Regions:
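Multi-pass membrane proteins that catalyze or facilitate reactions on polyprenyl-/lipid-phosphate substrates
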Residues: 2-22, 31-301
Length: 301
């Protein structure tokens, strides 16, 4: 596909959207990729980083390597994600701390609309897709109610966290950030981003690179050979994840971060008890943002 500067600028903006979603525990950058119409190309491009393409790189055929991995596309997306993560990490963590109901309400509407958006691409609901959907809902719901673990902070475990979290990040409905919460490393990694802890970030990114290049092959195969079933699972993931992004929560357990700030560790959903009108408005905004992004992506194709 021939693309111009305008196209790559748009791709970078889509990457910014993915990065913003990935910073929020409970929301997936993969969901945004699906909404803006780049999911399949993203998975296929990542999958193309393999032995064959790496051979081109190490034999000095860099132009052929870049073309083989759809490099212009990937660098645009990665640049957008990086800009978003490094610029929004402080803002998102502040909003989640000081205005949690508003943030979760917006993303609740966004994820709810995304569930419809992905689900409508399922061509047929049958004895294979319905169980796949139910399994997706159950797995995602279980993940959202799991208790965060106390884990080590050595570099090998940080590497594993990168490999595991990135797989979740490219799955619509499964939040890489929330996987980091369960692994006990969300605020640790956010702190590394804010302070630019280069060693921690490089080890985490190394794990992410290994994880995403491996998992993308599995996902690409599933989408090409079992698309309806795969989409049913992904739709289930998103519906099940709504439990995590419900705006009204009660804190059951807390922890103190490295700056002495008390933050929630385990939360339970409760009935709406504050900011109800504002939250409903933000849910509607999040819902229609997905609709707008879908229409915009369709017009720009």
């Amino acid at each position: 596909m021939e693309r111009g500067l305008k196209d790559y600028a748009l791709l970078m903006l889509k990457g910014v959207g993915m990065g913003a979603a990935d910073v929020v525990p409970g929301v997936s950058g993969g969901t945004i990729a699906f909404i803006v119409g780049i999911y399949d190309e993203l998975i296929d491009s990542i999958k193309s980083i393999n032995g064959k393409s790496l051979k081109l790189f190490f034999t000095g055929k860099w132009g052929a390597f870049w073309k083989a991995i759809n490099g212009n596309f990937l660098i645009s997306i990665v640049a957008g994600i990086a800009v978003s993560v490094f610029s929004l990490a402080k803002v998102i963590t502040w909003l989640l701390t000081d205005h949690p109901v508003m943030v979760w309400a917006f993303f609740f509407g966004l994820v709810l609309a995304s569930t419809w958006f992905v689900g409508k691409d399922i061509k047929e609901w049958n004895k294979k897709t319905i169980p796949a959907f139910i399994i997706g809902v159950a797995v995602a719901y279980y993940i959202t109610v799991a208790t965060p673990a106390e884990t080590p902070s050595n570099l090998f475990f940080i590497f594993l966290c990168g490999a595991i979290a990135i797989c979740a990040m490219i799955l619509p409905g499964i939040s890489g950030s929330f996987i980091l919460v369960l692994l006990g490393k969300y605020f640790y990694i956010m702190e590394a981003v804010k302070t630019f802890d280069i060693v921690t970030l490089l080890v985490f990114l190394a794990g992410a690179c290994i994880g995403i290049t491996t998992f993308s092959r599995v996902l690409s195969y599933a989408l090409k050979n079992f698309r309806n079933i795969t989409l049913a699972v992904l739709t289930g993931f998103m519906l099940g994840s709504l439990n995590k992004v419900w705006p009204w929560k009660e804190t059951l357990e807390t922890f103190t971060d490295s700056h002495g700030v008390v933050k929630p560790l385990v939360e339970a959903n409760i009935l709406p008890n504050q900011y109800i009108v504002e939250a409903v408005v933000l849910m509607i905004v999040g819902f229609f943002l997905v609709y707008f992004l879908e229409k915009l992506s369709t017009c720009l194709l």
